[in-house]
């Protein structure tokens, strides 16, 4: 039992050391996730606005743009990845 705990501790420390060596802690990883999701959302919004007519676009709220849901889904996925330790 002690050996399993020791091996687990070594693995956790190795992962932590790798992340520190990469210069990216949890805050850094969270910022990268937000940046990635913002880029995906922006791309979706650009595609949507390029096909909207002026009349329908001016009546749209920003929450109706596809990037809003893309960002939310992306952040949900990133949260799952963080909680699973990937």
Curated annotation (Swiss-Prot):
Residues 1-23 form the signal peptide. Interacts with human ADCYAP1R1. Changing residue 24 to S: No significant effects on binding to the host receptor, induction of cAMP accumulation and erythema formation in host skin. Changing residue 37 to S: Abolishes activity and erythema formation in host skin. It comes from the Eukaryota. It is found in: Secreted. The keyword Transcription regulation does not apply. Salivary gland (at protein level). GO terms for cellular component: extracellular region. Vaccination against the protein protects mice from infection with Leishmania major. Several synthetic peptides derived from maxadilan act as antagonists for ADCYAP1R1 in functional assays and in rat maxadilan/PACAP-38-induced increase in blood flow pharmacodynamic model. It comes from Lutzomyia longipalpis (Sand fly). This is Maxadilan. Its main location: secreted. Potent vasodilator. Activates mammalian ADCYAP1R1, a PAC1 receptor, and induces cAMP accumulation in host cells. Causes the development of erythema following superficial injection into the rabbit or human skin. Influences adaptive immune responses mediated by host dendritic cells. Reduces surface expression of CD80 on host dendritic cells stimulated with lipopolysaccharides (LPS) and induces concomitant increase in CD86 expression on a subpopulation of these cells. One of its GO terms (biological process) is vasodilation. Disulfide bonds join 24-28, 37-74. Keywords: Disulfide bond, Secreted, Signal, Vasoactive, Vasodilator.
């Amino acid at each position: 039992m002690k050996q399993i705990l020791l091996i687990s501790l070594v693995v956790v420390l190795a992962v932590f050391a790798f992340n520190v060596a990469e210069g990216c802690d949890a805050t850094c990883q969270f910022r990268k996730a937000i940046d990635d999701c913002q880029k995906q959302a922006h791309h979706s919004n650009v595609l949507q606005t390029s096909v909207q007519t002026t009349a329908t676009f001016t009546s749209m709220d920003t929450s109706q743009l596809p990037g809003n849901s893309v960002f939310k889904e992306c952040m949900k996925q990133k949260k799952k990845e963080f909680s699973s330790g990937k």
